Curated annotation (Swiss-Prot):
PANTHER family: ARGININE--TRNA LIGASE, CYTOPLASMIC (PTHR11956:SF5), ARGINYL-TRNA SYNTHETASE (PTHR11956). GO terms for molecular function: arginine-tRNA ligase activity; ATP binding. It comes from Burkholderia mallei (strain ATCC 23344). Belongs to the class-I aminoacyl-tRNA synthetase family. One of its GO terms (cellular component) is cytoplasm. Pfam families: Arg_tRNA_synt_N, DALR_1, tRNA-synt_1d. This is Arginine--tRNA ligase.
Amino acid sequence: MLPAQKHTLETLLENSVKQVVQASKGDADAAFVLPAIALERPKVAAHGDVACNVALQLAKPLGANPRQLAEQIVAALTAQPEAAGLVDAAEIAGPGFINLRLTPASKQAVIGAVLAQGRAFGASERDHDKRVLLEFVSANPTGPLHVGHGRQAALGDALANVLASQGYAVHREFYYNDAGVQIGNLAISTQARARGLKPGDAGWPEAAYNGEYIADIARDYLNGETVAASDGEPVTGKRDVEDLEAIRKFAVTYLRREQDMDLKAFGVKFDQYYLESSLYTEGRVEKTVDALIAAGMTYEQEGALWLRTTDEGDDKDRVMRKTDGTYTYFVPDVAYHVTKWERGFTKVINIQGSDHHGTIARVRAGLQGLHIGIPKGYPDYVLHKMVTVMRDGQEVKISKRAGSYVTVRDLIEWSGGATPGSEGSPELLDEATITRGRDAVRFFLISRKADTEFVFDIDLALKQNDENPVYYVQYAHARICSVINEWKSRYGATDALLPGADLSPLDSKQAMALMQKLAEYPDVLAHAAGELAPHAVAFYLRELASEFHSFYNAERVLVDEQAPRTARVALLAATRQVLENGLAMLGVSAPSKM
């Protein structure tokens, strides 16, 4: 049911309930509160198209039999002239459930709506006056983007698209942790490689990163190469193995450039890159700490500065400033979120790995302790669990200590079917391979709830059958394109015939089910935005593709008779549009041929 139809039906039912309550109570209780009208899709198709339990809700306060109340509500509903265009039949089930069957014309109306609105179908201006800052990926510039970052990138970009579809002004932000111990470890790792050392050698730093990518950084530094991140100034290797600060700057910029390349291949763009180091250079960390001290939110103990996080529900107070004068990692996070608030973002969503769960209470406690008007529960979080990668039936082993990762680039190349010899060499990959891999990786990583662990099966991503969910959805789109092209070629038809087509021939069970599924799309987007759940769009697309295949297998589209032929093509055109719209939300292509 389309949103406008749903609103109309809710209003009609509300009017009906008012009549029944008025008849039962008269004006004796003006304060009586009517229950909200909740419409649901019955779990069993045979029970109708829409179910409502309002009679059960009214039974106790009115002291009446719920089934009799349901009969009275239905009578009042069907007596309203406006209901005739929506409600075909009404039935009472069980103790008092109201099951409604919608008219064929009301179901067919979705086709005209989709064809008229095109890419805008499903979008809403419900939240047009709201701004939201969405922070995701936010990887340390100490190594390549791995599969966990890939899940964040896919979830974050899709959620940004979904929120934008509901009218939000979305600001995509990447927070670079370019300060602290890990950056120091990156610098000494690169310096050791530049000196000719490798993991296991005498003199290799214990805290160093062991990955081979460190050797690549050291090589380019010694060769005097110039590197630049997308938002920064170029940095040239000084070739001086003793200048640790020069090595640090080069290594950070080198890895930021590599991450930029990975994000570009993945189709993810950011509005802003925010550097942790700027919080220190601008004095924001010190200012935040001073404000918390002034607010009485801290205390000194054993030479360290503690934050009273238990005041805000944490299980124990947390150290802010260690005995050596350095800050613990959550302190700059508090300062960073103050900047988000000061920039006018009253709604902030962070997408992070589930290992960040422990920092939530600390960051929120710090923000509350500042007493600057930030609401409790700020910011919102979407936490995702781990991704395990399977290839050739075996788990791909990773070792953080050894510096071995499954990178985003690996996933794209493997899932795209990169030929042996081209893996690890982007310049050797054709655009089709990159697109195929990107589509598979994005769809797969979005296709499960964020808080569930996910097994990414490369072998499944390469399959070209209905076992592969992204292939299944994309194939539905491509099949429709093929049928419509054949329709135009064989009958000399054009798209102009479709908006005004007679849709009455679309009366089969399969056609009705497909049209109802199309009409659900706006609600799916609204739900995905409200629950911060982009996986709902992936679920929906698989269901829509399934309904299309059921219809296509049950009914010939290009029949001899013009009226049913044009009606069925119109249904296919609407289905194609919604598939395209949904895939676009996920950042996945909608191919016309496969």
